[in-house]
């Protein structure tokens, strides 16, 4: 389905609201296509005439839904429209907007300061007819734009606008001591055989924000006596370096890091991949809302360096429970990794862990595709997984250069 609005027409009051509706509705009528029609759900359908939508909008009224069915309808549309009865308040806004974003549906709205405060750039605000039509057309046509917009909005929701956050506010206002809602602490664990990749790794970890983290690095077959100092230059004060002998298996290196980890969650990173600044916080939020034991990314961007090409792989496999996440994104509760340690192998240690976790009936969740790019150098010796580029090309969608930037969104 295409474009939708849900609400009420007031013929007898709120003239500014009616003007906003005409602005957005006319844009929707211009932007709709046979496959992406404009639908209106009228809250007061069949009641007094003053609540009925006039033409040319009345012919687009498709019914009225109760609350539960309306929540299901939210997920069915590419774009939802929103207007604001109160346009100057920094706090008043329709709960519907937050519900839509939580359901994964982009919202185009007329402006209100509350929208920017609650959702940042995770919602599109328009005030002119051409601007409104352009926004609706773009969202209907571009699934990547829809996904990025929703992801930015959802990040704000999970960061500060769940019911748990509101309970925190109430308890704090009443002066009641309580444990506030927070993300779990994290231990980033990295085993590397490449001294020349350490600066890249430190830069990626140091860029993480909104996370209480420590870094644990296994230097596999080499010493890095200045690594702690280099980390602290970047603001990484909590770092543990564990030298491991060359003959140690990768699984043993990772287990050694998990045993030393202090974080509630351990997140495995690779030294050559690209992790955006919101990467880890997004995964920890996904772990919380999905009530998962293990999270990571299945759908993801992969940069094929030998071809200078980036592809999006496993596109349907995000925002769902699964039995697989990519090894460089594997993030699990510390007690899970201690109960199900990595096998003493140097290949497949992550996939065997996932298989055993699923067998133990633990919940594995594949989060969104964003803030991560898997780097494939084109040299098999650089990777523990030796599949060639053709594997990714066969199952991937080529992306324009900016689409895979880990800094976006």
Q: Which positions does each model-derived feature cover?
A:
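A recurrent flexible, glycine/aromatic-enriched loop bordering the glycosyltransferase active site
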Residues: 302, 313-332
């Amino acid at each position: 389905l295409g474009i939708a609005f849900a609400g009420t027409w007031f013929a007898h009051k709120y003239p500014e609201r009616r003007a906003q509706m005409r602005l957005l509705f006319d844009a929707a009528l211009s932007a709709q296509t046979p496959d992406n029609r404009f639908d209106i759900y009228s809250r007061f359908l069949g009641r007094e005439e003053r609540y009925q939508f006039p033409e040319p909008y009345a012919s687009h009224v498709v019914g009225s839904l109760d609350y539960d069915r309306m929540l299901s309808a939210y997920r069915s549309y590419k774009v939802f429209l929103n207007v604001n009865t109160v346009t100057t308040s920094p706090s008043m806004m329709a709960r519907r907007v937050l519900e839509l974003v939580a359901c994964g549906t982009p919202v185009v709205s007329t402006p209100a300061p509350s929208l920017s405060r609650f959702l940042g750039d995770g919602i599109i605000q328009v005030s002119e007819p051409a601007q409104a039509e352009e926004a609706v057309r773009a969202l209907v046509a571009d699934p990547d734009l829809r996904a990025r917009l929703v992801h930015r909005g959802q990040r704000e929701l999970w960061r500060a606008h769940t019911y748990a956050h509101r309970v925190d506010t109430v308890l704090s206002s009443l002066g009641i001591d309580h444990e506030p809602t927070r993300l779990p602490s994290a231990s980033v664990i990295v085993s590397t055989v490449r001294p020349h990749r350490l600066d890249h790794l430190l830069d990626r970890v140091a860029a993480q924000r909104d996370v209480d983290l420590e870094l644990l690095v296994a230097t596999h077959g080499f010493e890095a006596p200045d690594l702690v100092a280099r980390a602290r230059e970047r603001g990484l004060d909590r770092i543990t370096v564990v030298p491991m002998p060359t003959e140690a298996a990768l699984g043993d290196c990772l287990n050694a890091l998990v045993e030393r980890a202090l974080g509630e969650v351990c997140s495995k990173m690779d030294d050559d991949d690209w992790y955006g600044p919101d990467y880890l916080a997004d995964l920890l939020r996904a772990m919380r809302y999905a009530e998962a034991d293990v999270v990571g990314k299945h759908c993801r961007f992969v940069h094929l360096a030998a071809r200078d090409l980036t592809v999006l792989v496993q596109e349907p496999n995000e925002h769902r429970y699964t039995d697989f996440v990519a090894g460089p994104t594997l993030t699990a509760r510390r007690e899970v990794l201690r109960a199900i340690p990595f096998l003493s192998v140097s290949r497949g240690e992550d996939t065997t862990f996932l298989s055993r976790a699923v067998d133990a009936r633990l919940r594995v969740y594949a989060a969104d595709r964003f803030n991560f790019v898997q780097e494939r150098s084109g040299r098999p010796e650089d990777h523990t997984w030796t599949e060639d580029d053709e594997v990714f090309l066969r199952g991937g969608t080529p992306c324009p250069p900016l689409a895979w930037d880990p800094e976006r969104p």
